[in-house]
Amino acid sequence: MLGANCLESGDGYLRATLGGAIEAKIDWPNSGTRCQGEPKDRPSGVRLSFQRVPGGSPDLLFVFGITGVHEGRPARAAGVNVTVIVQGTNRLYGTLGDSRCTVDSLAQRPLDAKGVYRVEARGFCTQPAHAVRGKDSVLVSTFEFAGRVAFDGESEDAKQPFRIISK
């Protein structure tokens, strides 16, 4: 079952503007949004995911893979691999690398648990995320978020992975 809040502090969020196969203005507040994050390899950085508690329309899952982010350090002009999944369908869009999207700025603030940070970032994409199946594409022209990244590998997030729902 998805948790009801992104950050315990109440200040998590996701905002994004989407065009193309999905036309949407996303404005997800902390309440009702689930977020999780962890370090990633190849290339090294962090991966953050955002999803609304079921019931939203469209039911989307966003994954941001940000290159070159290190524990506790700010980042600028970092490449981002963006994936958008429409839950309950076979629609999956990805930039297939970090050259189409950029994080302008990223800041980290330590939270109570060791190795866990509030990560706030804003950025944009200059090219669309293409459908894995089909010819559609989605342009995430702007995005900004505040979520949680656990660098320690022992977070609650690892115990409760996102459910990808497919029909």
Please identify what each model-predicted range represents.
Residues G10-V116:
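Surface-exposed helix/loop patches within compact recognition domains
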Residues D112-K167:
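C-terminal or internal capping secondary-structure element at the end of a domain, subdomain, or sheet
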Residues G3-C6, C35, C101, C125:
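Cysteine-centric signal of extracytoplasmic or virion-exposed proteins
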Residues M1-I22, A158-K167:
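N-terminal low-complexity, Pro/Thr/Ser-rich intrinsically disordered segments
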